[in-house]
Amino acid sequence: MALITYRPFVRADLPRIRDLDRTERIDVLYIQHGTQLEERRGNFDSPNWLAEGTGEHSYAAYQAHLDELLASGAFALGAFDGDRLAGVGVLVQHLRRGIAQLAWLHVSNGYRASGIGKRLSDDLDRIATEGGDSEIVVSATPSQNTVRFYMARGYRPMAEPFPELFELEPEDIHLHKML
């Protein structure tokens, strides 16, 4: 791994999404009951995104989703290992009055636990604060690694998730923190 550089991730970078490897071994998933999290043991392998087609779990679908976020004014920050995308985070400011959304945060397998996710999250928190938001929400994949990452960053389960986010991701863990 070379020196990681951080810079705005712009629409011209969208094809780099194919650099990301989302594979992950998942032994524990969480189910959210208000502010309580129920741990469920499991035996799951999260596969990579599909290289072909436009289905829900394809690179094309994720690229289109990120394109929509960027077109709507979201700010994205990329972590690059040379020309290779190692991670990306997307911030939607003012989702609600004073509340930002961490709409997407992904660090490629092989780069996890290296500080990239922390740096992306911290930088996006700072940008949200500078933009006038005092709280941030995230809909997190319910895997133990992901939930622990956010909890270590100060996020806590929301008693009542935002309906518009819950509708999109009902199985996710809906978290928030004050900035």
Question: What is the role of each PLM region?
Answer:
Residues 107, 113-128, 151-152:
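Conserved acetyl-CoA-binding loop-helix of GNAT-fold acetyltransferases
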